[in-house]
Amino acid sequence: MAITKIILQQMVTMDQNSITASKYPKYTVVLSNSISSITAADVTSAIESSKASGPAAKQSEINAKQSELNAKDSENEAEISATSSQQSATQSASSATASANSAKAAKTSETNANNSKNAAKTSETNAASSASSASSFATAAENSARAAKTSETNAGNSAQAADASKTAAANSATAAKTSETNAKKSETAAKTSETNAKTSENKAKEYLDMASELVSPVTQYDWPVGTNNNSVYVKIAKLTDPGAVSCHLTLMITNGGNYGSSYGNIDFVEISARGLNDARGVTSENITKFLSVRRLGSPNLAWDNQLRYGLVEGDGYFEVWCYQRAFIKETRVAVLAQTGRTELYIPEGFVSQDTQPSGFIESLAARIYDQVNKPTKADLGLENAMLVGAFGLGGNGLSYSSVQSNVDLINKLKANGGQYWRAARESGANVDINDHGSGFYSHCGDTHAAINVQYNTGIVKVLATTDRNLASDIVYANTLYGTANKPSKSDVGLGNVTNDAQVKKAGDVMSGDLDIRKETPSIRLKSTQGNAHLWFMNNDGGERGVIWSPPNNGSLGEIHIRAKTSDGTSTGDFIVRHDGRIEAKDAKISYKISSRTAEFSNDDTNTAATNLRVSGKQHTPIMLVRDSDSNVSVGFKLNNMNAKLLGIDIDGDLAFGENPDHKQNSKIVTRKMMDAGFSVAGLMDFTNGFAGPWEAKNISDQELDLNSLMIKKSDPGSIRVYQCVSAGGGNNITNKPSGIGGNFILYVESIRKVGDTDFTNRQRLFGTDLNREFTRYCSNGTWSAWRESVVSGMNQDVSVKSMSVSGRLSGNELSVGGAGVLNGNLGVGGGATSKMPSSDKGIVIGRGSIVREGGEGRLILSSSGGTDRLLQLRPAGATSLDNQVEISCTSASAGDTKISFGQGAAIRCNNAGSPIISAKAGQMIYFRPNGDGISEGQMILSPNGDLVVKGGVNSKEIDVTASQSLPLKETTATTGIGVNFIGDSATECSFGIENTAGGSAVFHNYTRGASNSVTKNNQLLGGYGSRPWLGSTYTEHSNAALHFLGAGDTSATNHGGWIRLLVTPKGKTISDRVPAFRLSDNGDLWLVPDGAMHSDLGLVRSIETLNAAVPRFNAPSIQDGRGLKIVAPQAPEIDLIAPRGSGASAPAIRAMWCDGSLADTTRYIGATQPGSTFYIGASGHDGEKFDSMRGSVAIKSAGGWGPTSTPTQVVLETCESGSISRLPRWGVDHNGTLMPMADNRYNLGWGSGRVKQVYAVNGTINTSDARLKNDVRAMSDPETEAAKAIAKEIGFWTWKEQADMNDIREHCGLTVQRAIEIMESFGLDPFKYGFICYDKWDEHTVVSEYGPANEDGTENPIYKTIPAGDHYSFRLEELNLFIAKGFEARLSAIEDKLGM
């Protein structure tokens, strides 16, 4: 037979670069026919089989190995079982039933072991069969893996059965030896299972070896580290410079990040150390030469949520490290290629650490893009590149023909968006375009513009319009003037002007403006004698002003400027002299005076007069500037005194003194310096103390010995405070208390301070590592050991929250109060806690008696194990023996166990496990199943052996066949006809229907109407219930029942029905039975607890039937069929109880929107549509009917939903008093904006419900649109004067309600009442002005808080009464503008007085 062997290797091309063949697996395929007859399908099928065969065979080997291990475990467990059985024979006893179970479990173990053997044999057979042909390799490997898995499972069952055998054997007493024998059989069977599993493993391994010749799969490992809320650095490889040979490692890493996402990235990591020494090391610039990372996947996944890779260079080598952030788990690594001079530490040899290794240089991942995950311009380094549009932006334009009009052209352009274009008009059409001229079109917002350039002249035409005008067939056209299209005289309004190279105008009066346009224009006034004037006149010839210059001479030249009022008044000229001097009677300089020196010498003898006064609105009316890096000062000098200088030094600090160098003068302490902190060389004495934060010295991250922190005689101060503010900040701090790393505060306190060698200190340290306080003392430089602090009481009692005792704890009494915890064992009366079993907790007394708790919470009492071997319980008192209960045993390891009662009765269990119950001699033994004091049904065993049974003796089982009859006992405990099956099982008496043929087992209630009529609406058709025993009889009806009822009269077209569940509340009788659960015929679920509805309404199952029973209820019946209905008094609730467990409690009421329908055969489901709404609302009864919702919280879809966009908004809706319309009031939009749902309508807060504080980044934006306001009027004189007066009242105040608080902050402003008084004093009505506000309210009651819930679980609101009251308020922004106008008036008046 011809054999063909083909070797194939996968090829991949990425980014136009060939990938080396060594990265991808080879497949060796053997086909059982000649090369000439091989088809492509044969090759494909063989490759797929080979690819699957290798992993399957490998899995078969793994499963078989696991089967062997499980069988070995089974053997070990069987050995343990045998040992336990031996111990059982000498230690304890149990029931015969337990022994039988043990034997059965051992038998199960044997059976499972045989199953394991058979499964292993199956694995062997499948493995052998899989070698028969290459085309069946994959299937055979899968079967082998499955069979080996079965072997593993059965072996596991064997181990479990052996474990059951061990447990049962431990409890066995009567048949301990039998258990040992059965366990031995289990051991033998498990050994057989191990042998068979080993055979299966060998066969699978043999098959794997054969399959590995055909398949060479990629080696894949688990990433060695998984992170939770921590991050680590992991060393995964080391590569050494190979010189001229190869050194290469290629890895494919998957699932390396993207926590919480349903998809991830694949990282291809290329590593090579070749050329390392030539490159003279690894840098951030050349790292990609040695470590290159290509990432395939969605760019939407954050780059910092993935594995990141880098190198740490050594001498001739480098290590490869990965930074693994939090919550990266279950990552896989495939080795695509590996040469020599490489060391891979995966899966073994890796190193992980929390801190970044020294010298770590990261190589950023380069992304591989595909058709779905496309790069952005930024990814390609083309942020500023222009995108080429569909119609020529950056490319070629479009051409349009047969354009009929300007409107037609714009519509054509609009259809294709912004573009380059050219067009040709239809013959005879009136279109403002240059035929075949190129142009540009833009559409921005609702505006359009088209520019068209004639190709042979350059003449430009422009078309413009808006969407509204375009819809009305309006387009504006314009032809631009230029050198190729010059305007005529008439085009520019000069049709009547003669143009002969200049404009000529006769006469010396011009009616228009005169413009002089040249590089250096000028007007010359040439005076032959006298003054030269430039006059400014009124139309009537009256003078407004003049600029004139009198004749000059050798010593004087002047220019005068004069202005006059309308009545000809002028009180002074402004004169500019030739020497630069200016003269003015009253000068006002509005901006700046520049001068070398200025001196003001006031000869006024009035000492209260002012030499210089500077006023204005500027925040810096005087600025002293020195063109130097040195000091600048203001001087003060009196006679017979050196000048005092106030100024700033070169550091900008404010100082005062006599030295020109302010560095030598005293600094002035400013608020900024106080806030920032400053040093004081001398001792500061705070007579009244000080308040505010006390900042400790930060010693974090310092190398420091706490022993060095002392206060000696020469050291200033009595207390010093130090703080380590981080967990790692104390790594280099020594002599801390044990267990303290960082995060602590240390107080050093001076107690004695006689000299530098005669002093006493104390150190107190508080740390969060242990949440403890520690103290130690220093005497003359020698420190005592650290001790944990405790609290002492007046009577020397010690009360601690938690205390660890390493030695002995002595004293007369130990009290652990409240919920206190004693974490450890306790020895009492000399008891040694070392006798306590290591895993238990308890009390050891005296010679060894123990009260302890076992590992599963069992309470265990044990004596000291002496010769008495007794436990005595004395309920009547410590010395009362008559009522004691005594537990004893005859041997420490076997023998009898006995419970003796003080009255003489006893219960004993012998060594074989049989219980013996004995009474005092001559007394009887009573068995009372109905209770200690109830003799009914009792059984009595007399001293002579008689057995008296007060009841029937029933057989264990009754088999009813066709030849037998089962009598039924008639019951009188019910109305009507009733029969009972009588049973006496303490566990269960059941009645059932058994179907052994595969069909259903159903119990039906068949009901007819009277006289063979149809059943009626709400007729009880059947039910099931429970009737408890009352002591002498059963209840007349069920205390809990399930009823089936008809919905409407039955007919050929109506088979309607509904269900109700009736219960009787605790403490009530069946006459108070409540139909608490009703499942209506329309699918509604009604929950009606006790007291919610009268018993007359027991048949209500819908809104429709409730309206009929209670006409005034009058609720909309359209609510029927919509789901859950809960009727309860006061406070119906839906309680979502969600124990947290190991996750997070997150109960939810969730609406699930979608398009489509599940009600028809299409079953189409589509994306959520805009406007889908989820309401949480309330409706009420208006006295006539229930109406629709009048208040709601509505969650809405703000737009259509898709995979990348699911916008929602939340809207709060209410109905105001006096209205029946529900309106949306406030909403949170899809972008998070809190917005009122109507403009200029809703307030935040009111007079007696004010918002305490509003935090914002920017100020509020208030509408001030001129289109919405009347004209702004000027303020009257009284208003201006009132504004000035109000400004003078501004000061600081505090809230009266904060009078008893510390650290009260002062607020700046004034009261409304004072502002009202001032305005009224100027004859103004304050309440005509918007900045004066007044609100009042009537007395009303509100809920202030909710107390503990009522006994019935309803809410417990606590009300308070808000008394009638009122508030005065300001609109501060308007008040500030009002006051600002007063400031402006004052400043203007000052400027006028200064002549400015």
Swiss-Prot record:
Could you tell me where the Polar residues compositional bias lies?
Answer: 60-69, 189-199
MF terms from GO for this chain are: serine-type peptidase activity
Q: Whose protein is this, by species?
A: Escherichia phage T5
Q: What is this protein called?
A: Side tail fiber protein pb1
Q: Where is this site: Cleavage?
A: S1264, D1265
Its lineage reads: Viruses, Duplodnaviria, Heunggongvirae, Uroviricota, Caudoviricetes
Which UniProt keywords are listed? Coiled coil, Host-virus interaction, Hydrolase, Late protein, Protease, Serine protease, Viral attachment to host adhesion receptor, Viral attachment to host cell, Viral tail fiber protein, Viral tail protein, Virion, Virus entry into host cell
Q: Which GO terms describe its biological process?
A: adhesion receptor-mediated virion attachment to host cell; lipopolysaccharide-mediated virion attachment to host cell; proteolysis; symbiont entry into host cell
Q: Where in the cell is it found?
A: Virion
**One Pfam family matching this protein:** Peptidase_S74
Query: What EC number(s) does this enzyme carry?
Result: 3.4.21.-
Q: Where is the composition biased (Low complexity)?
A: 81-133, 157-181
Gene Ontology CC annotation, any one? virus tail, fiber
Q: Which residues form a coiled coil?
A: 187-214, 1263-1396
As for PTM, the annotation reads:
The cleaved C-terminus functions as an intramolecular chaperone and is removed by an autoproteolytic process after correct trimerization and folding.
Top-rank EC class of the record's enzyme: hydrolase
What residue stretches are annotated with the Peptidase S74 domain? 1265-1394
Quaternary context: Homotrimer. Interacts with the O-antigens of host lipopolysaccharides.
Give the residue ranges for region: Disordered: 51-133, 145-203
Q: Which InterPro entries match?
A: S74_ICA (IPR030392), WH-like_DNA-bd_sf (IPR036388)
